[in-house]
Amino acid sequence: MNFDELSSARMNEQLITHPKYNGVYRLCEPIEGKQPDGAWVMGMVYQDVDTLIKYWRPITMFGKFSIWEGGE
């Protein structure tokens, strides 16, 4: 599935910035078994990036070329 298809399929997803990686991430599905309750409701996500990156894996990063996968 390419980026345009993902964008069309997830019109409600938000973009977040992450200062550590100097980029903007488009979020996809929560990491299996990692997301806290209420993390993904009608396309809304945590605004606290420190909390967010523990539970979510971005699929696209704008800025530096990098892929980050979260979960500890």
Where are these regions (language model features)?
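Short solvent-exposed strand/turn elements
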Residues: 35-55
